[in-house]
């Protein structure tokens, strides 16, 4: 069965109830929340989904410079913790998967001083750590290929697929 949903981030700071009401009126059956475990209230999300007969099948991960899965340092650790916290949020709202962009959205040039191999290895290790936690909770992680105007890293389906194969994880 197919589900028709909309990702919430495209409406910006619109009130959740306004978005949910519009989705129901337009015949949608789902909503994709931004993976914002620190800003969204899971209980409010549940109430709105129930009120407007919606389901949440996925969360859209938000990855910036401070959440960089290609980083071996603090930004990489922060990204892993963010994904773990997002997994907990996904469980609360009934989402089955989280969309993951391995590098910061908006960084279109590879960081100086690192090879693509080093950055890829960092991403693989960080995503595996988050995937271990996701698997325990029954949540899948999905690598999203975004275009070259938004990232230097996994910016084609071929590159994203190669990363998935290298991660080699059930989650």
Please place each PLM-identified region on the residue numbering:
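N-terminal pre-domain/capping segments
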Residues: 1-95, 117, 128, 169
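Active-site acidic/histidine proton-transfer and metal-coordination neighborhood
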Residues: 74-171
């Amino acid at each position: 069965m197919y589900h028709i949903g909309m990702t919430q981030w495209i409406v910006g700071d619109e009130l959740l109830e306004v978005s949910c009401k519009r989705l129901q009126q337009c015949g949608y059956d789902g909503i994709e929340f931004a993976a914002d475990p620190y800003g969204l209230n899971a209980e409010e999300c549940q109430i709105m989904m129930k009120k407007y007969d919606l389901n949440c099948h996925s969360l859209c991960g938000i990855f910036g410079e401070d959440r960089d899965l290609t980083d071996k340092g603090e930004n990489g650790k922060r990204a892993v913790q963010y994904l773990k916290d997002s997994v907990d949020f996904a469980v609360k709202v009934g989402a089955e998967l989280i969309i993951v962009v391995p590098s910061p959205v908006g960084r279109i040039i590879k960081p100086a001083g690192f090879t693509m191999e080093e950055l890829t290895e960092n991403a693989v290790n960080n995503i595996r750590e988050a995937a271990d936690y996701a698997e325990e909770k029954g949540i899948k992680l999905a690598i999203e290929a975004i275009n070259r105007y938004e990232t230097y890293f996994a910016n084609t389906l071929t590159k994203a697929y190669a990363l998935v194969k290298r991660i080699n994880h059930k989650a």
